[in-house]
Amino acid sequence: MVLSCFWLPEHLFTHPEYRDCHLLYYTGITRTAKGILAEIVRSMFLNSSAHLAILENMKAHALDMAETIQRNDFETYGALIGKTWMQNQALDCGTNPPAVEEIINKIKDYTLGYKLPGAGGGGYLYMVAKDPQAALRIREILTQDVPNPRARFVEMALSGTGFQVSRS
């Protein structure tokens, strides 16, 4: 088995034109991942052709995403984030509960794409705003019309040092 490793430039995440377009919002909605992962793994072991096809498409999609980041193509990056969201929903019907859909409906016109990182169903909502003005509008909407007391924006930044493990 041959593994490939790609270096991905940070331009789409750090350049002033794009930096403020990446938004992370804690939805205040929770869901445990254990049951979700168990269902997906079960479908894989049962050779569910639908699930296996989705997983194969996700693999190709990850390579498309890497190529898009290497080309510094912001609009395609946002569209591919949206495609990721559609794939996640096809893999697990519990990915987008009504409370999450309500949040998305408020902001989707201002985004190129969005998704719930991780297992879905709640947690964080990552959004790629169309431009910095759209990002400001998203912040206004979700700050003025908070879906629950736990929901809030979370600052995020690309790490300059990468993943580090320390031992205490």
Please report, for each region that a protein language model flagged, where it lies by residue.
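C-terminal nucleotide
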Residues: 1-115, 126-168
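Short Gly/Ser/Thr- and Asp/Glu-enriched loop/turn motifs at secondary-structure junctions
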Residues: 118-123
